[in-house]
């Protein structure tokens, strides 16, 4: 090989290695206003190279328009973005709905970083009710008390129904062959299964969850804004209006499924315990948020909520260590984290 050809090959390789891509990050607050001066720590990794030594760190700030642009080599991809600014909830961006890990990464990203307004004491709890005889019956309206953290009588010790749930399910045809059914029934490990257990296993199902409220003016509204990479996933204040008196959700084990992952599903705001003025306006109400989705299937219901006990206070920022629900004897540290959140998950 001649020296001229070797030099040409070297030049081509170097040119390919330095050919880069331009990236632009835009940081906005919960009102879609640009955030200037936000500190950025951006980590890029070389594709198909697990070595930390191949990564690149960029540290800078957003400009007056809330944006920051930078370039990277063609073989580098975004791996992690940390965003900080005093008075805002910090963000750790590694995997989002848009996905900086997507198969076809974009060159422009917009991320929300909500302001820290006035964190306060809230009732915060992760509800996870599984199938137990008489605990969560289907085709029955079940009231849930956000302040007590329990279903109302006769299914729990709750006193006031903030919200009412109605679960139902129906078979949607067999999902396995008759031979597979016979094999499962002959399995010694499944000898304690009931006929209902086998019916649930061997069939596809349709599920429906209805949500309603006991008094006029109360309701629920879906919140499209979602920052799963941020300490505060939803806007800090519940909206003043727009609440629906009821909501029905349906899904099937055949799909398509309405949500791919808990962290990618926004949530809901709720207005409950409403007292109306003589002119029909809302004189008093309590506000709650459900972070993520309402999971329901057969005799199972789970959701995470944050309830403000102060009437007419729409603020729903949980202050660290200010969860009104406290640890009690018999709850493990893991359960304390899961069921008594100290911050928004």
Q: Where is each model-derived feature located?
A:
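Sec-dependent signal peptide recognition
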Residues: 1-10
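Beta-strand-rich domain onsets/edges
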Residues: 9-33, 41-43
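Short, ordered, surface-exposed loop/turn motifs in non-cytosolic proteins
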Residues: 31-50, 76
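A domain-level signal for the mature, folded cores of soluble proteins
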Residues: 116-279, 305-315, 323-345
């Amino acid at each position: 090989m001649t020296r001229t050809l070797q030099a040409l090959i070297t030049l081509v390789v170097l040119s390919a290695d330095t050919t880069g891509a331009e990236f632009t990050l835009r940081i906005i607050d919960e009102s879609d206003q640009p955030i200037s001066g936000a500190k950025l720590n951006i980590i890029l990794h070389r594709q198909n190279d697990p070595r930390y030594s191949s990564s690149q760190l960029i540290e800078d700030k957003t400009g007056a328009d809330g944006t920051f642009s930078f370039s990277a080599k063609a073989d580098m991809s975004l791996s992690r973005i940390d965003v900080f600014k005093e008075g805002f909830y910090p963000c750790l961006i590694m995997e989002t709905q848009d996905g900086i890990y997507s198969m076809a990464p974009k060159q422009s990203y917009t991320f929300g970083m909500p302001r820290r307004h006035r964190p306060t004491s809230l009732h915060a709890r992760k509800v996870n009710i599984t199938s137990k005889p008489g605990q969560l019956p289907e085709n029955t309206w079940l009231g849930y008390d956000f302040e007590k953290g329990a279903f109302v009588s006769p299914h729990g010790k709750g006193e006031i129904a903030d919200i009412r749930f109605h679960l139902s399910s129906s078979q949607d045809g067999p999902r396995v062959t008759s031979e597979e059914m016979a094999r499962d029934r002959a399995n010694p490990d499944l000898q304690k299964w009931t006929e209902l257990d086998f019916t649930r296993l061997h069939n596809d199902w349709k599920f429906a969850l209805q949500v309603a409220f006991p008094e006029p003016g109360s309701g629920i509204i879906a919140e499209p804004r979602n920052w799963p990479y941020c300490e505060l996933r939803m806007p800090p204040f519940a909206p003043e209006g727009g609440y629906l008196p009821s909501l029905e959700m349906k899904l099937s084990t055949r799909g398509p499924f309405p949500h791919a992952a808990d962290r990618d599903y926004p949530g809901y705001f709720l207005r409950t315990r409403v007292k109306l003025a003589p002119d029909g306006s809302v004189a008093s109400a309590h506000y709650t948020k459900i972070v993520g989705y309402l999971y329901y299937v057969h005799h199972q219901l789970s959701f995470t909520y944050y309830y403000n006990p102060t009437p007419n206070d729409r603020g729903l920022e949980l202050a660290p260590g200010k969860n009104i629900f406290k640890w009690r004897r018999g709850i493990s540290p893991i359960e304390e984290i899961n069921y008594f959140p100290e911050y928004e998950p």
